[in-house]
């Protein structure tokens, strides 16, 4: 799940930079990892990760779909709102799984100093 947290942070940084191509990629990565976690880790420290109930998955499905729409629309204002809803859903899921001490939030700055989150100006142009 730590990898999901990394994608969650990179999703914010990409959206904030209006790099919609990267934001779409990070969102797809998150969705893929959440799906894989259910299959690959049926339990983690006695928590039924692989048996997340429909309510838990619905908690995430709505915000994920809303984020996808905002990315497609390139709508930064509503992207921020949708991102915060996803973050709330992540924290609600943690509460449900009895790990509410893991609190996710918007990143404050970037720890990914080797990655440029600004969109490329044109195809084929090397990043700064």
Locations of regions flagged by a protein language model:
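Sequence context surrounding c-type heme c attachment/ligation sites in exported
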Residues: 1-128
